[in-house]
Amino acid sequence: MLIYKDIFTDDELSSDSFPMKLVDDLIYEFKGRHVVRKEGDIILAGSNPSAEEGAEDEGSDEHVERGIDIVLNHKLVEMNCYEDASMFKAYIKKFMKNIIDHMEKNNRDKADVDAFKKKIQAWVVSLLAKDRFKNLAFFIGERAAEGAENGQVAIIEYRDVDGTEVPTLMLVKEAILEEKC
């Protein structure tokens, strides 16, 4: 299994247990699902917990959690402050600078850095379009929530796919470390 970790905070932001694609060699997109499950259960995409555990006792006092499977599995924390476009712009400007500094510090080719700048700017402009920005939710990892600075904000866009709302988590590739576990 591959875990996708934030290079700045070491937070686990997603894994290859979710359908994923790389868009424009810039953004990882992971398809999530809305789920309801007993608190603490970690269900991998594609598993069938009802078939494995038998019938659920509807009269129990167990706490049930609802949400997006990626968010629940990786303990991401919602950050409503970024729903304000000016706050998001301030964050993304600093984040882009941190990524570029990281690329340069790791001796990345100037052409790679320039290509990244061009692509990331176009992506950010597309996110800030009013009809798109209102469909975004923002999440951070546990360490970032505890105060670790410079972490990546995981952006979830709610997309309509054949009449079904599909939460799609987006992560900037250059700020992600793939780790086998």
UniProtKB/Swiss-Prot annotation:
GO cellular component labels: cytoplasm
Compartment(s): Cytoplasm
The keyword Ribosomal protein appears for this protein: no
InterPro entries listed in its UniProt record: Mss4-like_sf, Mss4/transl-control_tumour, TCTP, Translation_control_tumour_CS, Translational_control_tumour_p
Primary location: cytoplasm
GO molecular function: calcium ion binding
Domain TCTP stretches: 1-181
Entry keywords, A to Z: Calcium, Cytoplasm
Gene3D superfamilies cross-referenced by the UniProt entry: Metal Binding Protein, Guanine Nucleotide Exchange Factor, Chain A
Listed Pfam families: TCTP (PF00838)
Protein family membership: Belongs to the TCTP family.
PANTHER family reported for this sequence: TRANSLATIONALLY CONTROLLED TUMOR PROTEIN-RELATED (PTHR11991), TRANSLATIONALLY-CONTROLLED TUMOR PROTEIN (PTHR11991:SF0)
Function noted in UniProt: Involved in calcium binding and microtubule stabilization.
Protein name from the UniProt record: Translationally-controlled tumor protein homolog
Naturally occurring in which organism (per UniProt): Caenorhabditis briggsae
Lineage: Eukaryota, Metazoa, Ecdysozoa, Nematoda, Chromadorea
